[in-house]
A protein has these predicted regions:
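Mid-domain Rossmann-like dinucleotide-binding core that forms the NAD(H)/NADP(H) cofactor-binding site
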Residues: 199-259
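Short Gly/Pro-enriched turn/cap motifs at secondary-structure boundaries
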Residues: 48, 73-74, 107-113, 175-180, ...
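Cytochrome P450 core scaffold surrounding the K-helix E-X-X-R motif
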Residues: 94-96
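Cysteine-cluster motifs in flexible loop/terminal segments that predominantly coordinate metals
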Residues: 140-193
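N-terminal secretory signal peptides
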Residues: 1-11, 15
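C-terminal segment of N-terminal export signals and the immediately downstream linker at the start
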Residues: 30-71, 85
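N-terminal export leaders
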Residues: 12-29
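Glycine-rich beta-strand-centered segment in the early N-terminal region that forms part
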Residues: 75-89, 102-152, 157, 197-201
């Protein structure tokens, strides 16, 4: 795939995973080692029959950040929602900060995790882009108004109506626990707009880190229209930095590593 083809394909973050699956030097070849199955769901045969979703998880109960097993209920699947049986959830350093209250007072118990992949096991009546059995991923957001100017322009994190819901720790009166709960769990309910399809030729455990770390380093390349011959500085070659270096666009760019 040449540079022009890549640039034409990368018109939105929703094409990101598809590109990573088709370009030989794609980011999934990083084989990131910080994913692990959180709940052994592979043998489960889940059938949603309506009502709240019983969920098993690992949660923080105080600012120690220690995670312990916890069972709770999620809100019912709405008309525009999908229910995902989670297979893998990556560990992001921001999970640790939030669970320890480093960014302000937290509501506990709280289930972290915002790099989530799994299998769709139920869909709302208005959902057309997913069906039961599809492979799906979820990042750091699960809902917004989708009607304001920011949402319509793909900036749901800046929802003008202040209805952005992040994947965990956000107040949500629809949830039995009063807040959103994340991906270190067996299941998650998410508005279909905030889920992406995971291509069949990406291993689920390798796709998970792309839902935050991968997209975080991908987005600025697109926002600033990085082109062949441009110089890009990568500050630190850690969890995000090494994924930045493996972005397919980087084969056309001079890379400056800042340690």
């Amino acid at each position: 795939m040449d540079k022009d083809s890549i640039m034409n394909t990368l018109i939105s973050r929703r094409n990101f995973l598809k590109l990573s699956a088709t370009v030989g030097v794609g980011m999934v070849s990083a084989r990131t080692a910080h994913t692990a199955p959180i709940i052994p769901t592979a043998q489960m045969k889940y059938h949603y029959t309506g009502g709240n979703v019983k969920t098993k998880a690992y949660a923080a109960f105080d600012e120690s950040g220690e995670l312990r097993p916890w069972e709770f209920e999620r809100r019912p699947v709405g008309d525009n929602d999908i229910l995902i049986e989670i297979k893998y959830a990556s560990i992001c350093h921001s999970d640790i900060h939030q669970e320890k209250g480093d960014w302000g007072k937290m509501t506990y118990p709280q289930v972290p995790g915002h790099e989530i992949v799994g299998i769709v096991v139920a869909v709302g009546k208005n959902v057309t882009k997913f069906k039961i059995g599809d492979r799906a991923g979820v990042g750091c957001m699960v809902d917004s108004c989708l009607e304001c100017e920011s949402c319509k322009n793909g900036l749901e994190q800046h929802c003008d109506n202040d209805q952005t819901l992040f994947t965990y720790g956000n107040p949500d009166n629809r949830e039995p626990t009063s807040i959103t709960q994340g991906g270190y769990s067996s299941h998650i309910v998410v508005r279909d707009h905030f889920a992406v399809h995971i291509p069949e030729n990406i291993k689920l455990q390798e796709a998970a880190p792309l839902l935050c770390a991968g997209i975080t380093t991908y987005s600025p390349l697109m926002k600033y229209k990085i082109n062949k011959g441009d110089k890009v500085g990568v500050v630190g070659i850690g969890g995000l930095g090494h994924l930045a270096l493996m972005n397919p666009l980087m084969i056309f760019i001079k890379i400056i590593k800042l340690r």
